[in-house]
Design a protein with these regions (language model features):
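Extracytosolic ligand-binding ectodomains
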Residues: 2-9, 14, 24-442
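C-terminal motif of bacterial Sec signal peptides marking the signal peptidase cleavage site
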Residues: 19-22
Length: 442
């Protein structure tokens, strides 16, 4: 599906960003994309990983309702082979958001246990960061396992790209997809490009303990999943579930971990408005899992991280991006293969600036993900040269009956660009923007 793509690296800072801003239109003219033929201002609308998926388009029946809407999501240029193998797991996949990150979360967990010679999370947690840099490069479990069994050090470059974990157990740099909706309200894969944000030099330097001697254990590695099968992030569930299942399939095809097949116990995270995640975590812990992959939602993870890590179980999320996890007191048992919002905010702000927008409105979900990404985006826009009064950031309650007041504030502000940072409720917000002539609808 990701065909006709291009790749580039984010290195636009300081004066370069100021130069791009200076090339944009005036406040009256809007951005360079805006209504050039009619002379009318076309507001540019942007999304992020919480809504930039084909599931968003399913809420719109009118052609062109999302046409031209752009956005960012952690994404690498996945190989056709990897995507085809995911489709063998789930032939109905619509997109691949966080499939690579989920696959890598499972592989890293298995490699850490293999390296430690133990399925005890408090033992193998010390190996996780060191598996992502500094050693011999490998790209799948089988080849990495061969290196470990020979006493070597591993640098796992996975499906989501080189991970290069920093000390908090998160990527120091990451690939982001720049996505755009077409007239049919689906993502136009021909317009997808990729950028790199962050710096691999910020990766940790401690490669951790030496691998334990190769051997077997009587206890199989048991991995639970806490992924969104229901709730406002359910559209992310299928690719994440497929990524986890494919990883376990590959691990067991290579002989499993410490001579035993890995066991996978699946579970639903729901969303932050329910206690589904708490119930699932209780069930997984009672089942004796050694690690839990999930949740996707930062808000959901914050409700269960203490229960998981205080039980001596590792949590590794493929999609948490809130900055709160970088400094969270997690007994060194929390990791993530998704990059923190500081990196996505940089990619998003660069995209907005490169499109020539001089004024920016932000509508952000009032939760750790939404407020964190909004704050970081505002800072990056200001670092790029926009003044504080050229940016208006509003938070909203996703459970609200309507978003009329928030939309009206955007109408009154009349910015060149509007960023919607949300989940499934984003469609209702965008519908309101369209009805008021400031949405993506062409």
């Amino acid at each position: 599906m990701r065909t006709g793509t291009t790749a580039r690296s984010i290195a636009v800072t300081g004066a370069a960003l100021l130069a791009i801003t200076a090339c944009g239109g005036s406040d009256d003219e809007g951005s360079t994309d805006a209504g050039a033929d009619s002379g009318e201002k076309q507001v540019n609308v942007y999304g992020t990983d919480g809504n930039m998926g084909n599931a968003l388009g399913e809420d719109f029946s009118e052609e062109g309702a999302l046409a031209g809407m752009k956005g960012t999501t952690p994404l690498t240029d996945l190989s056709d082979d990897f995507k085809n193998r995911l489709l063998e797991i789930d032939p109905d996949l619509q997109d691949y958001n966080y499939a690579g990150e989920t696959y890598d979360a499972v592989i890293l967990t298995a490699l850490a246990a293999q390296a430690a010679g133990s399925t005890e999370a408090n033992v193998f947690k010390e190996y996780v960061n060191g598996l992502t840099f500094g050693g011999d490069t490998c790209t799948d479990f089988a080849s990495c396992k061969e290196i470990l069994d020979a006493g070597g050090n591993v640098d796992y470059d996975g499906a989501s790209g080189p991970l290069s974990f920093a000390d908090p157990g998160e990527p120091a740099e990451a690939s982001f997809g720049l996505l755009q909706f077409g007239d049919d309200n689906t993502l136009d894969d021909e317009l997808t490009s990729f950028v790199i944000a962050g710096d691999e030099d910020n990766a940790a330097t401690d490669e951790g303990p030496a691998p334990a001697p190769a051997g077997a254990t009587g206890d199989p590695l048991v991995i639970g999943t806490l992924l969104p099968l229901t709730g406002n992030l359910a559209f992310l569930g299928p690719p994440e579930v497929a990524g986890a299942a494919l990883a376990v399939q590959d691990i067991n095809a290579a002989g499993g971990v410490l001579g035993q097949p890995v066991q996978l116990i699946e579970g639903d995270s729901g969303d932050a408005s329910t206690d589904t995640a708490t119930q699932t975590v209780d069930r997984l812990l009672q089942s004796g899992v050694d690690a839990i992959v999930g949740a996707a939602s930062s808000g959901v993870s914050l409700t269960v991280i203490d229960a998981i890590t205080q039980a001596g179980v590792m949590q590794i999320s493929p999609a948490n991006t809130s900055d709160q996890f970088t400094t969270y007191n997690d007994n060194n048992l929390y990791f993530r293969t998704a990059p923190p919002d500081t990196l996505q905010a940089r990619a998003l702000a660069d995209l907005i600036i490169e499109d020539g927008n001089n004024t920016v409105g932000i509508l952000a979900l009032n939760d750790p993900y939404g407020t964190g990404l909004a704050e970081n985006t505002v800072q990056n826009l200001m670092d790029a040269g926009l003044s504080e009064d050229a940016i208006q950031s509003i938070t909203y309650d996703p459970q609200a009956a309507n978003f009329d007041s928030e939309v009206q504030e955007m109408v009154d502000f009349n910015p060149d660009a509007i960023v919607v940072i949300g989940f499934e409720e984003s469609s209702r917000i965008i519908e309101g923007l369209n009805q008021n002539g400031i949405g993506p609808q062409r």
